[in-house]
């Protein structure tokens, strides 16, 4: 059982009374329709969504993962322990896309024992975060649907299941290649990858229906396996409810060597990203 989950269960069972801390639960954010798993108890403000809660939005949504017993996290990596009622956490800390791990621990008393806590936050990480925010504004991505609009069935498992067109505005001349990632952050078991491609030649338009082959000639790119276990694009096919599907474009300063999963691809481009842009669409299946 995860560290925070374990603390949460102890609290639910009546142990450690008087302590306030971040607990894990499942609730729906009315703002971005995300099923979030973070709840900040006590004076630190109640429920806070990973999209920013009261002030954030889908374009700022970042992922949180379950914490294991060592306190380590997956990518996006913000871990916040807020066990002391005298401490407050900010409603929103945005580390999305820099794939850095920042673990913030606060001092507390749990079941009569003091938990020593440390803040691990290198200045370079925060500098990278600021740079990332600026970079995120530099590309405009458009498609066959409006940002936040419904994805046409043509591009889903209920239709032709072909990739939608992507129009990219604002590319710099020194960009060497593009990376494409399409993912569903609302999947029941965590982020689900629908498409990854790298070494995409810099272009202002990626036409629809990219062939489902590893190597593509027009435009030139290399495609990896998605979470369906297939090469290339496979579209939205949510088991229930309305899901969000992000099409993320990274403009980088190099060509990549190797074969990658989504996580490996994100690690490979770290430190090489010149520009970034995204568009997301919504899709739910008729029952």
UniProtKB/Swiss-Prot annotation:
CDD domains: PEBP_bact_arch. Pfam families: PBP (PF01161). It comes from the Archaea. Gene3D superfamilies: PEBP-like. InterPro entries: PEBP, PEBP-like_sf, YbhB_YbcL/LppC-like. Belongs to the UPF0098 family. This is UPF0098 protein AF_1698.
């Amino acid at each position: 059982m995860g560290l925070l989950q374990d603390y949460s269960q102890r609290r639910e069972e009546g142990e450690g009374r008087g302590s306030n801390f971040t607990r894990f639960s499942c609730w729906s954010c009315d703002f971005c329709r995300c099923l979030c798993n973070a709840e900040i108890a006590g004076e630190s403000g109640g429920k806070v969504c990973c999209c920013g809660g009261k002030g954030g939005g889908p374009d700022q949504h970042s992922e949180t993962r379950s914490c294991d017993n060592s306190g380590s996290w997956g990518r996006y990596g913000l871990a916040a322990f807020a066990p002391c009622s005298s401490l407050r956490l900010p409603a929103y800390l945005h580390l999305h896309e820099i794939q850095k791990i920042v673990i913030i621990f606060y001092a507390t008393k749990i079941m009569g024992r003091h938990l020593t806590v440390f803040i691990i936050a290198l200045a370079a990480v925060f500098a990278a975060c600021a740079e990332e925010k600026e970079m995120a504004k530099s590309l405009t991505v458009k498609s066959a649907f409006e940002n936040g609009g419904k994805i046409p069935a043509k591009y889903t498992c209920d239709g032709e299941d072909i990739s939608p067109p992507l129009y990219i505005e604002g590319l710099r001349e020194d960009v060497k290649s593009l990376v494409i990632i399409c993912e569903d952050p609302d999947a029941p078991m965590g982020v689900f990858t629908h498409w990854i491609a790298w070494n995409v030649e810099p272009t202002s338009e990626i036409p629809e229906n990219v062939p489902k082959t590893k190597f593509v000639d027009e435009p030139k790119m290399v495609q990896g396996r998605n979470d369906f276990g297939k090469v290339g694009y496979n579209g939205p096919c949510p088991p229930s409810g309305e899901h969000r599907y992000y099409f993320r474009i990274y403009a980088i300063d190099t060509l990549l060597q190797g074969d990658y999963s989504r996580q490996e691809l994100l690690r490979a481009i770290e430190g090489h990203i010149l520009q970034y842009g995204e568009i997301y669409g919504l899709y739910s299946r008729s029952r």
